[in-house]
Structures are given as C-alpha cells and as structure tokens.
C-alpha cells in the first residue's frame, strides 16, 4: 500500500479553509481513481513539543506509488490539485511513499 500525507499549514482564515475543504475539496479528492482510504485529522494537530503550525493532516491510501501517480495525473486528481490555492493559504507539504507493516 502507498500513502499520501498532506500537511496543511495554518491558513490565513481557518474557518474559510474548513468550509472549502469540507464542501469542495473532500468531494473532489474522493473521486480520484484508485483511492482506497481517505482520513483527515480531527481537532488540533500538536507535536511532542506543543503547537505544530499544522492546521490539518490528510492521509490518502492507494495500492501503490504508481496508483498515486496515476490518480494525481487523472482529470479528477488535476481538479483536486487546482483547488488547493483556494484554501491552503498557509502552504502545504505533500509526501507520498510505499509502506510496509512491521
């Protein structure tokens, strides 16, 4: 399995971020081909040292990194990515990787 982890940094307007994310971004992202699971953080995101500067963490699961690349290259993936500047005003880091159970 492969995961995509998105770290959305604190936006200029958290309420506007949350509204757009829930009403527009999630429905778009859920249409990406090959998406197996989609989770988002709930409540504050903190680090062991305290506040993190991260507003939301999203984890999307696919069968493989190739499936991730295919999904992000699809029309649905491109539409999802095109909306990011509309709400992620604090910036975002997007990481993807193959995982294994240990």
Region spans (language model):
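Macromolecular interaction modules
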Residues: 1-102
């Amino acid at each position: 399995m492969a995961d995509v982890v998105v770290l959305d940094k604190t936006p200029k307007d958290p309420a506007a971020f949350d509204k757009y994310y829930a009403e527009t971004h999630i429905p778009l992202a859920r249409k990406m081909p090959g998406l197996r699971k989609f989770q988002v953080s709930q409540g504050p995101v903190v680090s062991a040292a305290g506040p993190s500067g991260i507003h939301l963490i999203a984890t999307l699961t696919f069968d493989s990194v190739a499936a991730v690349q295919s999904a992000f290259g699809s029309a649905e993936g491109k539409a999802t990515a095109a909306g990011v500047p509309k709400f992620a005003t604090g910036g975002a880091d997007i990481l993807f990787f193959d995982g294994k159970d240990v």
